Amino acid sequence: MSTRKLNMLTPEPIHLLEEGGDNSEEFVVDEGCQVQRIYVGDGSITTSDEAKFTIWKVTTELIVHKVEPVRVSIPLEIVSYRRYSEFDQLRAEIISKIGKNVQVPELPPKVYWYDYWRFSKINLNRHWLNKRRQGLDNFINKIIKNKDIMESCAKEVNEFLGVSSDVSTRTNSE
């Protein structure tokens, strides 16, 4: 029987601001739903079968607009948990779908195989983990703010964030 150990990092959300622009812009997920904010925080270090890795908490704050019977905006928060490799997979899916025509944001550096022997030390270093969290936060926010990427890959990004296309329908029926 394997034991699991979790260590929590304190969340330190960052906000991506576009240079010279109005940062109050909302990004449409579907007709009745807009992303207010996305942030990566709360990295949990987990041990399973002698392998250590970090799972990142990705929080998507949405505003769902309901028109009938009365116009109202409902805040909604969706939380998903992702490993670095899942961010990497999302980036690869975006690149394969849109090609090299659009510049896809970079991810923070990987731990390469020749450094793997040091991985457990790196993976427990709070400074290194905070830098990685900031890089992942920066990556996902740049993806969301890139209209070319979102026009082509909204389905993939929404699935990654745990946002389904019927989120406003689910909320309206509650």
From Swiss-Prot:
Role of this protein: Recruits the lipid transfer protein VPS13 to endosomal and vacuolar membranes.
Membrane topology of this protein: Peripheral membrane protein
Gene (name only): YPT35
Database matches in SMART domains: PX
Free-text note on domains in this protein's UniProt record: The PX domain binds phosphatidylinositol 3-phosphate (PtdIns(3)P) which is necessary for peripheral membrane localization.
Protein name: Endosomal/vacuolar adapter protein YPT35
One GO CC annotation: endosome membrane
Gene3D superfamilies from the UniProt entry: Phox-like domain (3.30.1520.10)
Any one GO biological process: protein localization to membrane
Compartment(s) where it occurs, according to its Swiss-Prot or TrEMBL record: Endosome membrane; Vacuole membrane
Highest classification ranks of the organism: Eukaryota, Fungi, Dikarya, Ascomycota, Saccharomycotina
Main location: membrane
Source organism: Vanderwaltozyma polyspora (strain ATCC 22028 / DSM 70294 / BCRC 21397 / CBS 2163 / NBRC 10782 / NRRL Y-8283 / UCD 57-17) (Kluyveromyces polysporus)
InterPro entries: PX_dom (IPR001683), PX_dom_sf (IPR036871), Ypt35_PX (IPR037917)
Family, per entry: Belongs to the YPT35 family.
Molecular function per GO: phosphatidylinositol-3-phosphate binding; protein-macromolecule adaptor activity
Keywords: Endosome, Membrane, Vacuole
Keyword match Membrane: yes
Domain called PX: residue spans: 34-168
Domain of life of the organism encoding this protein: Eukaryota
